[in-house]
Every structure is written in structure tokens, then in C-alpha cells.
């Protein structure tokens, strides 16, 4: 039977290793690699990451996917402004057609520029994982593993939906105009829920006609 839009359980059943959250104000001392897959979500601030032979500028909402054996180093940037980083370590990931602990990278770019709904979902997963670690309740490992797997699945779904469009300096998940506008309108409702909202006001803020 042909495999179509399906991730088999034996492929996406990684071992959860760790999560770590910290604020970086100095360069990471070592240019290094791991024998596991590492995710780094930028929760706030701006900085730089050296991944392979390329230095990427990173900002809030970016998700870095560092495959096994890839050398990398977190850099604070010229102004050394604080960068809040959230790391997740996984191993035993075996996706079809890829090496062990390798995740597909559109255009071979390890930096995913997330925004809108995807960014909100990733942020919530990071917060849920952090809360689970602090609670130390029964089944903590499996809860944290589930959250990490959701992060990977969200990326796979976005790659499938958007056809892997590119943006300079990273992989953008901005899709068709309609989806983009829906996300912007949703953001507007969340920011102004306590105010009186009219169609004219929404259209004015979105630079749209009320007919559209």
C-alpha cells in the first residue's frame, strides 16, 4: 500500500531527552554538535545562530531545527541583547527517507519563521512543557514527549499546507493571502476584545474594503 500523507508510529515515536529554558546574553562558548535532534524556539529578543557554515539572524517566533551531527552555536549578537531560548532534545526519530534524528528542512534551511496561529501554538506548547516539568506529577515524561511531538507535527503540517515557500534568511510559513488575513483578523479580535468592534473598523485597520 502506498504511503500518502501519513506518518507511521514507528517513525514519529522519539525518545524525549530534555527541555531547557534560558536567557542568553553572551555567546555560547563552543561550536558543537549532538547525537540527537535539538529544537530551539526563540521566545523573545533577537540574536544570531551559527548553524553549519551559515550565521542566521533569529527573532521571537523563530524555531530552529538542528539535526543530529550538525555543528551549531548560539550567538548573542553585536548588541548582546537578552534572547530567551527554549530547547527541546529528542532522539530515536526515524522519518522515512531521512537519516536518524533528522527532520525535513525546506530548502535545507534550519530556521523556520513562524507567525500567526502557528507561533501561538508553539508558544503554548513551550509553556505547557515548562509547567509540566515544574509540577513533577505522574506521567510527566509522557506529557512532555507528547508536547514535543506536537511541535514536530505542526511543522510537518505547515510544510504540507503551504508548499514550503521561502523567505530570505529563513523558511517562512506565510501562506495564501486569505489565510494570512484570517490570522490578522483573529489577532485583532484578541487584542481588542474589550472594545466595541465594527466591520468598518476592522476593514480600516486591515486596509480592506468592507465588501471584501
Feature annotation, model-predicted:
Residues 1-63, 70, 76-78, 94, ...:
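Generic protein-terminus/edge-of-domain signal
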Residues 184, 188-212:
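Basic/polar phosphate-binding segments, predominantly the helix-turn-helix DNA-binding elements
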Amino acid at each position: 500500500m502506498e504511503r500518502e500523507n501519513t506518518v507511521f508510529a514507528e517513525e514519529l515515536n522519539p525518545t524525549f531527552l530534555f527541555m531547557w529554558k534560558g536567557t542568553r546574553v553572551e555567546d555560547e562558548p563552543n561550536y558543537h554538535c549532538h547525537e540527537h535532534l535539538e529544537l530551539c524556539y526563540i521566545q523573545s529578543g533577537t540574536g544570531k545562530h551559527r548553524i553549519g557554515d551559515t550565521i542566521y539572524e533569529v527573532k521571537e517566533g523563530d524555531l530552529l531545527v538542528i539535526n543530529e551531527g550538525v555543528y551549531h552555536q548560539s550567538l548573542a549578537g553585536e548588541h548582546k541583547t537578552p534572547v530567551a531560548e527554549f530547547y527541546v532534545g529528542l532522539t530515536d526519530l526515524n522519518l522515512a527517507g531521512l537519516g536518524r534524528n533528522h527532520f525535513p528542512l525546506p530548502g535545507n534551511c534550519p530556521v523556520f519563521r513562524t507567525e500567526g496561529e502557528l507561533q501561538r501554538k508553539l508558544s503554548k506548547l513551550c509553556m505547557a512543557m515548562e509547567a509540566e516539568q515544574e509540577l513533577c506529577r505522574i506521567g510527566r515524561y509522557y506529557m512532555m514527549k507528547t508536547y514535543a511531538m506536537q511541535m514536530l507535527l505542526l511543522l510537518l503540517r505547515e510544510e504540507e499546507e503551504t508548499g514550503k515557500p521561502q523567505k530570505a534568511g529563513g523558511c517562512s510559513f506565510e501562506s495564501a493571502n486569505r489565510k494570512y488575513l484570517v490570522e490578522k483578523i483573529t489577532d485583532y479580535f484578541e487584542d481588542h476584545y474589550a472594545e466595541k468592534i465594527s466591520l468598518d473598523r476592522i476593514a480600516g485597520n486591515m486596509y480592506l474594503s468592507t465588501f471584501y
